[in-house]
Amino acid sequence: MATKISHLVSLLLSLLLLLLFISSQVGFTEAKRDERKKMSSPPIPSPLIPSPPIPPPPPRFYVPPSKSRRGKGP
């Protein structure tokens, strides 16, 4: 009877240690993920300093001026 109890106690202690180990690993992984999010996210701009306006993008294709009399085509 005493051996069954000691085996049960050792099993419960092993399961408890396993649970603690897994929970610590999950917490460590979440902390790393949060740290990476902070590093990759852009800094929060200060409301006192306005950001400069973004210039419009350049045109994609160069269209030369028309050489025809009607103004259409090349």
UniProtKB/Swiss-Prot annotation:
Motif (SCOOP motif): 60-74
Keywords, in A-Z order: Apoplast, Cell membrane, Cleavage on pair of basic residues, Membrane, Secreted, Signal
Biased composition (Pro residues): 42-62
Localisation: Cell membrane; Secreted, Extracellular space, Apoplast
Locus of motif SxS motif essential for MIK2 binding: 66-68
Region annotated Disordered, chain positions: 29-74
Signal peptide start and end residues: 1-31
Entry keyword annotation includes Isomerase: no
GO molecular function: LRR domain binding; receptor serine/threonine kinase binding
One CC-aspect GO term: apoplast
Superkingdom per UniProt: Eukaryota
Family affiliation: Belongs to the serine rich endogenous peptide (SCOOP) phytocytokine family.
Subunit structure: Interacts with MIK2 (via extracellular leucine-rich repeat domain); this interaction triggers the formation of complex between MIK2 and the BAK1/SERK3 and SERK4 coreceptors, and subsequent BAK1 activation by phosphorylation.
Annotated function: Brassicaceae-specific phytocytokine (plant endogenous peptide released into the apoplast) perceived by MIK2 in a BAK1/SERK3 and SERK4 coreceptors-dependent manner, that modulates various physiological and antimicrobial processes including growth prevention and reactive oxygen species (ROS) response regulation.
Descriptive protein name: Serine rich endogenous peptide 16
Gene (name only): PROSCOOP16
